[in-house]
Regions:
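A short beta-strand element within the Helicase C-terminal
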Residues: 87-91, 308-312, 316-333, 338, ...
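Conserved helicase ATPase core of P-loop NTP-dependent helicases/translocases
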Residues: 55-59, 268-272, 277-319, 338
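Conserved segment of the helicase C-terminal RecA-like domain
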Residues: 345-373
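Post-DEXD/H (motif II) to motif III coupling segment of the RecA-like Helicase ATP-binding lobe
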Residues: 97-157
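Conserved Walker A/P-loop ATP-binding site and its immediately adjacent core
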Residues: 24-61, 125, 276-277
């Protein structure tokens, strides 16, 4: 199987609506444009996740269909309802963003042919899409399939287990932060002497390991409350704490990632970060939603003018990277979709390398074990020192 074989199979698909579930890096944009080209028509609706992704599609159209004379309407999922009307064709990029609001809005659209693109779509969403798009044809290729067929390269993976500090109280936990009384300073050992009272705020000094233990306990508490009550308030509290935990763990890896960067030297590197602040801490050329120079940095990277970029969310999907060899996961994510999308950012290099530092005996360890299911075990190396990384 080759890219040409996939394209040939997609072009031969009959019907009016198609969901193409293809790994990032297989050329979904080109395949979709070729399908639209084969259908004919005069109007095309192109829906993307973010405004910044519009330029990527503009470049793809120039590259693969320079003589296109269709009238193209480009919008985001947020603005989709504003563009209700009649179209010959529609491309829904990253179709897993077709929310209930967007699906309801499609009742006001008259679209002859729809092409839905995504790297991963949940079974629940597939069922919902089948209800919206008449006779939806599903076409899927798994990531391992395309790697084993040499369409995408098999990445070399370095796993670097780390330990949270348990020897010195470097962290602070605030209890009763809204209380109006005098602030109480407490050690970890004495915390229960003060935490049951609600009059005074308590600042507990603790180690990194103790901090994550407290956070784990809070998460378990709110999870149980939600499972008993099904209260949306409790659910939101539980999920917010889960996000806080991953962000905190990611922040604690910043100095380790900085050491890895120094070790790698001039290899072309992308760092997946948890926040805008972390992108700024880990690199001069950061790509995030607040940086007005993000597109310029991306273009400079693709042109080979710079070798290191950092990103927060914006590069998970919908953006092309040229010749990026090394990916460092400063931030881990529980979403299988994001895991596969990030991997696809790197598989455009012929010898990709993925580096995953994580803290042992934390939620991160569970996520790493899940990630390993996507990798060739023969190419996975567990190291105890970043200096053992060899590109």
């Amino acid at each position: 199987m080759t890219r040409k074989d996939i394209l040939k199979e997609v072009l031969s698909l009959e019907g009016n609506n198609w969901l193409l579930e293809l790994p990032t890096g297989t050329g979904k944009s080109k395949i979709a444009l070729e399908k639209v080209k084969s259908l004919g028509g005069k109007t095309l609706l192109l829906v993307v996740n973010r405004n910044v992704h519009k330029q990527n599609w503009t470049d793809e159209i120039k590259k693969w269909w320079s003589n296109c004379n269709m009238k193209i309407t480009m919008t985001t999922y947020v603005s989709l309802p504003k563009y209700a009307g009649k179209y010959d064709c529609a491309i829904f990029d990253e179709a897993h963003h077709l929310s209930e609001r967007c699906r309801e809005a499609l009742c006001s659209f008259d679209i002859k042919h729809s092409i839905l693109l995504s790297a991963t779509v949940s079974n629940k969403l597939k069922d919902e899409l089948i209800e919206v798009f008449d006779d939806l044809t599903l076409y899927k290729k798994d990531l391992r399939d395309v790697i084993e067929n040499d369409i995408l390269p098999d990445p070399k993976v370095y796993i670097l287990p780390l330990n949270l500090r348990a020897d010195f109280p470097t962290e602070v936990i605030m209890k009763n932060p809204k209380a109006k009384g005098k602030l109480i300073e407490s050690s970890w050992a004495l915390r229960w002497s003060y935490m049951k009272q609600k009059t005074n705020p308590v600042r507990v000094h603790c180690t990194q390991r103790q901090y994550i233990t407290d956070l784990d306990n809070q998460i378990e508490y709110w999870k149980k409350r939600y499972l008993r009550s099904r209260s949306e308030i409790f659910k939101n509290k539980w999920l917010r704490l889960c996000n806080d935990r991953l962000k905190w763990l990611s922040d604690k890896k910043t100095p380790y990632v900085q050491q890895i960067l120094i070790h790698l030297g001039e290899y072309r590197t992308l760092i997946f970060c948890n926040s805008i602040e972390q992108t700024e801490m880990l690199g001069e050329y950061c790509i995030n939603s607040k940086n007005k120079e993000s597109i310029e940095h991306l273009e400079a990277f693709n042109e080979g003018k710079i070798d290191h970029i950092t990103a927060c969310n914006i590069l998970n999907e919908g953006m092309n990277l040229c010749n990026c060899q090394v990916g460092i996961y400063a931030n881990l994510n529980s979403s299988d979709t994001i895991v596969k999308q990030r991997m696809g950012r790197l598989l455009r290099h012929k010898n990709p390398v993925i580096i995953v530092p994580y803290f042992k005996n934390t939620r991160e360890e569970e996520l790493v074990n899940k990630m390993l299911e996507n990798y060739n075990p023969k190419l996975v190396t567990i190291i105890d020192d970043y200096k053992k990384i060899k590109i």
